[in-house]
Amino acid sequence: MKILLIGGGGREHAIAEGIKKSKHNPSLYALMAKKNPGIAALCEDFLLEKETEVEKVVEYAKARNIEMAFVGPEAPLAAGVADALWEAGIPVVGPKKSCAIIEFDKAWARNFMKKYGIEGCPEYEVFTEEKPAHDFIEKLGDVAVKPSGLTGGKGVKVMGDQLPDLKAAKAYTSELLEKGSVVIEERFIGEEFTLQAFVDGKSLVFFPAVQDHKRAYEGDLGPNTGGMGSYTDAGEILPFMLPEDLEKAKKIMQDTVKALSEETGIGYQGILYGQFILTASGPKVVEFNARFGDPEAMNVISLLETDFVDIMSAVVKGTLGNLPVSFSKKATVCKYAVPAGYPENPEKDSEVTVEDIGDASIYYASVYEKEGKVYTTSSRAIAVIGIAETIAAAEKIAQNALENLHGKLFFRKDIGTAALIQKRIDHMKELRG
């Protein structure tokens, strides 16, 4: 079977490995904006092209007689790549544009949740003008401010965090209003977690819960990033969660998929990503994404025991409910090595060498190859993942691998450590009283 992967990041490298491990021995093709050396090594052939060039994507897929496609990042979904491939007779794992809007229009997503009474929605309003927006900030007093469109996970600012006070919240709102509409919502206090699922339009197959670390520096300090690393526990839930927290989050996602079918008239087929915050009164929705998280994809794909291509086929055929899907009962810790100075002033074009990474797996993200050597760009460079019986053991494997990457790199040593996880557990105990 010929499969096309669209996208060229660390997440897509993990997806490519998942596809290549299949017993069906598929031929993998890729279309990516920049050459990812990890993906290129797994492919029969690849095309370097902007992933949002819809006609070029379809043209390449037809020329290579592609039988099924997987869209990795959000931008091509927002551009309608899935719609165009289906029209060309090529089934796609990745929702059509009318469903992917749940990620690329934050205002639409909140209004949709409200319309269908989906649990976990904050008090919020959407604004296009400054005065009513500022008045609403005064009314709520503790807010999150979001641009309506795609921001690569870096556009949201929260009071008590990136926004020190009401004045800062108003100033950021005014700045965003110059570019478009703004969503202002009540700020939730709690611990964030990610729940991802394969969706075939009706049925959902859930991956274990993951916790990502958005802040650049240790101790959850510094600016937001695309994600510095993430971990899963040996079961479905994280150490600070209760089983009922997971069940509530699953129900929210099931209700969302059902409501999307009702709203759009088509089934949501692909990956649904729920970003939740666990509060004293249960899980609330931070946002939905229409694709795997990066780094969270690395954690969960590495645990999958069921054939990845079988799952892809079930997603596009709508038969996911008949496929038993299983995961290895192990813990994972994923950590990103990023260029020194990232995210604000990253050192580009620095050579990276990889020594013995032991039992870890390695995924290339924003790097490039020149004369057989690997160099950094301005974004996250290389992810390593440790898999073991416990989070502590997985963390050691990942950390050891990072110590064997050489170059002008930086990483967070605290992700997956007992001290940081205990901090999360204590925080939730305190909130729950």
Curated annotation (Swiss-Prot):
Its EC number is 6.3.4.13. The gene is purD. Keywords: ATP-binding, Ligase, Magnesium, Manganese, Metal-binding, Nucleotide-binding, Purine biosynthesis. The lineage of its organism: Archaea, Methanobacteriati, Methanobacteriota, Stenosarchaea group, Methanomicrobia. GO terms for molecular function: ATP binding; metal ion binding; phosphoribosylamine-glycine ligase activity. It comes from Methanosarcina barkeri (strain Fusaro / DSM 804). Residues 110-317 form the ATP-grasp domain. This is Phosphoribosylamine--glycine ligase. Mg(2+) 2 binds at E287, N289. Binds 2 magnesium or manganese ions per subunit. SMART domains: GARS_A, GARS_C.
